[in-house]
Amino acid sequence: MKNLPLRRGQLVTTFGPGALVISPEGESAMIGALDKWYHDKNECRIETLDEFEIQEPRLKSLLKVKQLLMPPDFRPSYEYKNAVGAITQTNTDLYIPLLRFPTWQYCPKCKTLHQSSMSSRTSWLDCKECKKQMKMIQVPFVMVCSHGHISDFPWREWVHGDENTLCEGQMKLLSTGGATLDSLKIKCSCHKERSLKGIMSRKITSDMDEHRVSELSKLLNKNEKKIYKCPGNKPWYGSENYKESCVSYPIAVLKNSINVYYPNTISAIHLPVENPEVEKLIHIFEKNGITLSWLQVVDGIENKIKVVKKLCSSEIQEYKYSDIELAILYIEEGLGVESSPEKESTRNAKKELRTKEFETLIQDIDTKNLKIKKEWTCEVVDKNDISTFFSLINRVTKLKETIVLTGFNRLTTDDKAAHNQMLKGKHLLFKDPDLPENNWLPAYKVYGEGIFFTINFERLKSWEKRPDVQSYFNKLITRTEKRGINIDVDVIKPRNVLLHTLSHIIIDELAITCGYNSTSIRERLYLNEDQCGILIYTSSGDIDGTYGGLVRMGRQEHFFPVVVKAIDRARWCSSDPVCSEIGRSSGQGVNNLNGAACHSCSYLPETSCELGNLLLDRTLLIDPNLGFFNY
């Protein structure tokens, strides 16, 4: 495989450690563990990471890490040599480790299976059957489990019906020409053969993973009742032989399937420090390369202040001693997310992040990384006016968002599973997470603009308490309970489904009106008990952010007509009456968690939605009897 260019932002989301990437030539490889990032071509770790560090103390405090680091960019050393051959640039020739996976491949001519090492960089191998070198094709299947493990499909064990087989015969992957797994079979030179029927099936007998027995686990061992368990492989650690104990039942999936890798990320909007002087000092420190790792070298706050004054003497001489001290403490300790016993829960800490953002977004602010202009506050008395359903509109002309990769899931995006993976995410991302030098997580920062608005809270509470709304919504709660689905109880509320659906239809309308592709517009929901806000924004990796088209739509003369059009458009789906009727009766979408919502009316691209296109229902918006906007 040739060197594969990836964007830095992709390494924090879609293509993080443990993910499979496909090259333009069709070869697949796995991103290596974080232990091997920031190593040069000689496999040596670089000495300083200061230039990659992102200052977001709130997230560092929440995630209990010392550093948030941007993935390294590639700088070829030959471009930075002077006339005498000396390298004039630091941190050159940094690669992200790639490991060939799956390691099994077959000859396109004779279909014979061959296995190569994960370090192999070529698809050209000597075919024992054809007696010449052939460009091999990697097999389409891998084996995964919901605990994050991934392995080569057990071809030899499957064809012999025995996980302890000793046969080392030559195998072939043959097709009889059909379009189902039954038409694919594996054949061994010992005359054993078997179709692949059932390898991707799973029978669910309980909401507990240990009882979700896959057909692969039940059928692999033909002659005994032994259930096949996941071997616990973590090939992204760099070794084909690394295994750990696992009680899960694996399942075969296509290697390019979306459920092979679901990244778990957490993000935060950068908020200004309450003291504007401290905020300015933090930016001065960042500009001069004064980071957390740098401050930790110096002992004592007084010594740190002395050294900082020497490095930034001309820029900070007018600032108070106390402000300089606070700026240093902010970087070191992450002031802003207090650590207390009652806030040790990750869920509570995430809520605290959103609460502080909400409290900031309702204000008028003008700082370097966050600029908010108050546009409109509800003063209208006319109940027939659409504006009476809203209480506030603010135009966010500039924002900075930091996105951190905390772990990943395979097979499921279940809320409880995602929460558990976040708690143990470092053990998936790092081979040795407890080493002092591994106390960091990969992060990426983006700049953008957006519209922040809140719903009339009193009107929302009154609507939510109506018996017909409660009766209708209880159907969704019953469906989740019957299926044993784990979703945060604070999320399953009529108001939250309403806000989420409203966000989607407004994003769709904004994409049509202001020319943005809907994939580039995102939502950020504020759903805590006393909040009912939505931030619709767009962002990019460029520090200049975007061009103001979305912010312009936040002006009241543009925003309310957009809302009216969005609601009118939501009244009819091209899949109606099916969409509406199924939504009212049995629900639809993954685990039937949606009401009247489908790809034709309410779904957004995955990059835009915070909740995976779940918990959507147009009925709560526009139904003549119980719709919020008809109340």
Question: Predicted segments — roles?
Answer:
Residues 118, 200-202:
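Short, surface-exposed polybasic-aromatic patches that bind anionic ligands, especially phosphate groups
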Residues 206-210:
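A Rossmann-like FAD-binding core segment of flavoenzymes
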Residues 186-190:
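C-terminal interaction appendages of subunits in large macromolecular complexes
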Residues 165:
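A short alpha->loop->secondary-structure connector
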Residues 1-159, 170-175, 182, 227-631:
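Extended, well-ordered protein cores
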Residues 203, 217, 258:
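Nucleic-acid endo/exonuclease domains
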Residues 131-134, 192-199:
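Short Cys/His-rich micro-motifs in 6-15 aa windows
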